[in-house]
């Protein structure tokens, strides 16, 4: 075991018993988090002053249906937390506009690969500073990736496909960063454009706030002071209430032209309240409204509704423990789900049937993947074969604020009652829910089902599936919240990671998709969602990207006539 392996083993021990909720509680107990976390020496923005700021045309206000639960870019793996982080944090490169396979320079001004794409070299942009004024050079970029990989949380599993040891990343001079993958890795470029994980942090500042060997993680979950390079700084974070970004005057991109000075995120869980706020002009952007709310807003000429299919698949995680421990029991759940009623009756055309666990927009999707229908007789037979008796109690846990998902769960509840299964639906706040998804409690202590949705970090089916179902992605290591583990699936993942032959690569991905859908279900994959974003019609510069779902490039957005 290398020095890195020993270090990583020690750190995984430190992190494995923690989840985001426990870290937040620990930070609060240590006095890190006042009632409203205030950053950068600025005072809290009161409700009254928030309303005044919203009236400022240079302020963009977004109503979110749930609160960010984490501000550390090296652990964030949910989109509500990722949404504001596009303001303060940047990567080496990014996706270009709405493209899923074209890239633009950000902190790196240029990059190239050797002939077999096993070594990638990035030249850093000159003159970039962190928000504390310190320079961004190749060494601090290397240190940022070392922190990310060594912590080993959430999105780090995606990077370990390409880089297993931080020693594979070097900084031979002040402006050059080299990634030596050891094997041909043509997808490293795609990975480094992701909004989850490969973002550059000012590690020396984080380490000044280290506690018990956590790399400053507990502090960075609630603070961004001096850590980022982006056009905006986080100046206030009041969990479950609001988060405020203000522009960083010394941003390397400059401030010529029309830009927002401030971005306010208001946490409004009630669907009807968010709809009223966008109608009344009290907020500029909302998403995740119900189909009924979107239809009610369609005739409003003051609003623009963007409807775009994305890389997202919606599903119910099936925990591989207790009554659902066997493939037969999980197959029964898949046969019992009311697919047509949910798609047509609940989502009203804002989604379509998923074909397995991968969106049709993602490279590696197999359209021949097995697709269930609703058949309660088959479900009943499979439950009997799995020795799951009538009267069995199951719990489905979901995040509050998703009225459409709740309606779908209630229809499922009705179907299960017809075959003798009692399903309880439990709604919890985002922080509690991400504790279930990313926490490390045993499978036996988890809900039997969890309503979740997922899209890839970059445009690749392997990446889409690996965090959800790989045996080493349980709990805080990824998003395998059901503790699924299939030996054949893991064998295919391990054999295919570096597969250079496109045909063999696709064959392995197709087999994985069939196994998790038909033979040994990991989840009930029921819908490919049509993502909707409602904007006031004076907001310019919004571009939907099917991979970067639920985030906004605030720097290129503006308000008409406010220059």
Q: What are the functions of these language-model segments?
A:
Residues 63-115, 146, 227-231:
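N-terminal lobe/hinge region of extracytoplasmic solute-binding protein
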Residues 96-98, 195-255, 262, 270, ...:
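Gly/Pro-rich hinge or "lid" segments in bacterial periplasmic/extracellular proteins
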Residues 1-22, 26-37, 44-45:
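N-terminal secretory signal peptides
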Residues 29, 33-44, 80, 238, ...:
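Detector for C-terminal structural segments
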Residues 232, 352-385, 400-407:
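Structural transition elements
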Residues 109-154, 172, 178-180, 188, ...:
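Aromatic- and charge-enriched surface segment that lines or borders ligand/interaction sites
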Residues 123, 158-210, 236:
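Surface-exposed binding/hinge segments that line
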Residues 220, 250-296, 422:
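Ligand-site clamp/hinge motif
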């Amino acid at each position: 075991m290398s020095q890195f392996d020993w270090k990583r083993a020690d750190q995984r021990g430190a992190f494995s018993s923690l989840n985001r909720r426990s870290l937040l509680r620990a930070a609060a107990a240590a006095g890190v988090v006042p009632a409203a976390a205030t950053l950068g020496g600025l005072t809290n923005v009161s409700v009254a002053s928030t309303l005044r700021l919203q009236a400022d045309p240079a302020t963009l206000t977004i109503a979110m249906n749930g609160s960010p639960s984490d501000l550390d870019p090296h652990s964030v793996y949910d989109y509500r937390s990722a949404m504001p982080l596009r303001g303060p944090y940047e990567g080496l490169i990014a996706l270009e506009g709405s493209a899923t396979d074209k890239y633009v320079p950000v902190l790196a001004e240029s990059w190239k690969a050797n002939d077999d794409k096993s070594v990638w070299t990035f030249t850093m942009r000159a003159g970039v500073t962190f928000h504390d004024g310190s320079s961004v050079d190749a060494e601090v970029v290397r240190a940022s990736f070392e922190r990310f990989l060594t912590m080993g949380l959430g999105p780090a599993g995606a990077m370990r496909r390409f880089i297993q040891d931080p020693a594979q990343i070097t900084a031979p001079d002040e402006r050059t960063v080299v990634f030596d993958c050891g094997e041909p890795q043509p997808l490293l470029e795609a990975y480094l454009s992701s909004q989850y994980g490969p973002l550059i942090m000012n590690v020396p500042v984080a380490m000044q706030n280290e506690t018990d060997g956590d790399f400053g993680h507990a502090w960075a979950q609630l603070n961004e002071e001096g850590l980022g390079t982006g056009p905006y700084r986080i100046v206030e974070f009041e969990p479950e209430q609001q988060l405020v970004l203000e522009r960083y005057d010394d941003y390397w991109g400059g401030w010529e032209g029309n830009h927002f000075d401030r971005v306010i995120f208001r946490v409004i869980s009630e669907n009807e309240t968010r709809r009223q706020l966008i109608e009344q002009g009290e907020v500029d952007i909302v998403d995740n409204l119900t189909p009924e709310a979107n239809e009610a807003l369609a005739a409003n000429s003051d609003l623009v509704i963007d409807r775009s299919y994305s890389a997202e698949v919606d599903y119910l995680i099936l925990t591989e423990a207790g009554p659902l421990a066997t493939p037969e029991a999980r197959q029964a759940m898949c046969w019992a789900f009311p697919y047509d009623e949910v798609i047509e009756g609940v989502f009203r055309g804002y989604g379509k049937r998923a074909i397995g666990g991968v969106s049709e927009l993602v490279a590696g999707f197999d359209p021949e993947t097995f697709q269930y229908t609703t058949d309660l007789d088959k479900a009943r037979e499979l439950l009997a074969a799995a020795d799951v008796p009538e009267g069995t109690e199951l719990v489905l846990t979901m995040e509050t604020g998703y009225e459409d998902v709740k309606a779908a769960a209630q229809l499922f509840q009705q179907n299960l009652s017809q075959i003798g299964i009692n399903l309880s639906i439990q709604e919890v706040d985002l922080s509690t829910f991400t504790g279930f998804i990313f926490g490390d409690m045993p499978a036996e202590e988890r809900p039997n089902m969890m309503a979740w949705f997922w899209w890839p970090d970059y445009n690749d089916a392997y990446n889409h599936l690996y965090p959800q179902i790989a045996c080493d992605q349980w709990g805080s290591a990824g998003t395998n919240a059901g503790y699924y583990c299939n030996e054949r699936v893991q064998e295919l993942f391990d054999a295919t990671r570096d597969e250079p032959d496109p045909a063999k690569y696709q064959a392995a991905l197709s087999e994985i998709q069939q196994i998790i859908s038909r033979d040994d279900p990991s989840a009930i994959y029921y819908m490919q969602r049509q993502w909707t974003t409602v904007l006031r019609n004076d907001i310019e510069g919004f571009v939907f990207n099917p991979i970067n779902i639920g985030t906004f490039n605030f720097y290129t957005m503006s308000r008409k006539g406010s220059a």
